[in-house]
């Protein structure tokens, strides 16, 4: 997205303050990406569309939950983008879970320098529920297949009184993953067409339960 700040602000539908933070994050990302592998190098030339817009669509799908968990945060998509957007909401917070120490260090710098509302947990995804007891939304991008993601998310989504919603980016083969997942779980599913890549989707999942074995 080679555009002026005004054009970007209009296209992304964000405030000038949020755009400033997104642009600062973009600069940090490009600097750090020279030394550590944050995303596929082939996507760096289209950073805004492939990663920023792709991440922003998740935030727009949500009913503005206060507490997010982003699993396998990697280069910060969608976790840091969500945290930046939540900067305008005083009670919002994003927990970024990333076990790679170099990537976790980058995420800390990104949060600190942009003033985004979040914290970094340099732990394995499986350990996250014991550190983060509750959340209202879960996100993950390019982390695992849907069944594994639901296993990771189950401690939050199956908790008594939970209304946690999950948002997972998936490619064109998403239906195969859904078909596999329904053999173990029941859930409400909404498929949102990706605004970035044809045939890709964001899966919105709620009311998760495990199927009872016969």
Swiss-Prot record:
Q: Which Pfam families match?
A: GidB (PF02527)
Supply the alphabetized keyword list.
Cytoplasm, Methyltransferase, rRNA processing, S-adenosyl-L-methionine, Transferase
Q: Name one GO cellular component term.
A: cytosol
Reactions that this protein is recorded to catalyse: guanosine(527) in 16S rRNA + S-adenosyl-L-methionine = N(7)-methylguanosine(527) in 16S rRNA + S-adenosyl-L-homocysteine
**Annotated Gene Ontology MF terms?**
rRNA (guanine-N7-)-methyltransferase activity
Listed binding positions for S-adenosyl-L-methionine are: 72, 77, 125-126, 141
Subcellular localization is given as:
Cytoplasm
Do the record's keywords include Cytoplasm? yes
- The EC number(s) given in the record are 2.1.1.170
| UniProt xrefs under SUPFAM superfamilies | S-adenosyl-L-methionine-dependent methyltransferases (SSF53335)
| Top EC class of this enzyme | transferase
Keyword Transmembrane helix recorded: no
Q: Which parts of the chain span the membrane according to its record?
A: none
HAMAP family (UniProt xref): 16SrRNA_methyltr_G
Q: Which NCBIfam families match?
A: rsmG_gidB (TIGR00138)
- Family to which the UniProt record says this protein belongs: Belongs to the methyltransferase superfamily. RNA methyltransferase RsmG family.
Q: What does this protein do?
A: Specifically methylates the N7 position of guanine in position 527 of 16S rRNA.
Name of the molecule in the record: Ribosomal RNA small subunit methyltransferase G
Q: What is the lineage of its organism?
A: Bacteria, Pseudomonadati, Pseudomonadota, Alphaproteobacteria, Hyphomicrobiales
């Amino acid at each position: 997205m080679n555009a002026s700040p005004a054009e970007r602000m209009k296209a992304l539908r964000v405030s000038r303050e949020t755009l400033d933070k997104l642009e600062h994050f973009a600069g940090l990302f490009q600097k750090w990406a020279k030394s550590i592998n944050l995303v596929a190098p082939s996507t760096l030339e289209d950073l805004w569309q492939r990663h920023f817009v792709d991440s922003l669509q998740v935030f727009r799908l949500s009913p503005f939950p206060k507490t997010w968990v982003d699993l396998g945060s990697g280069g910060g998509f969608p976790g840091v983008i969500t945290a930046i957007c939540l900067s305008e909401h005083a009670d919002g917070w994003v927990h970024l879970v990333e076990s790679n120490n170099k990537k976790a260090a980058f995420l800390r710098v990104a949060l600190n320098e942009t003033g985004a509302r979040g914290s970094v947990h340099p732990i394995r995804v499986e350990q996250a529920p014991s550190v983060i007891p509750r959340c209202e939304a879960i996100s993950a991008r390019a982390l695992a297949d849907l069944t594994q993601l639901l296993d990771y998310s189950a401690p939050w989504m199956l908790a008594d009184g939970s209304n946690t919603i999950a948002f997972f980016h998936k490619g064109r083969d998403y239906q195969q993953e859904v078909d596999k997942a329904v053999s173990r779980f029941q859930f409400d599913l909404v498929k949102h067409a990706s605004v970035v890549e044809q045939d890709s989707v964001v899966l919105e999942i709620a009311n998760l339960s495990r199927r009872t074995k016969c």
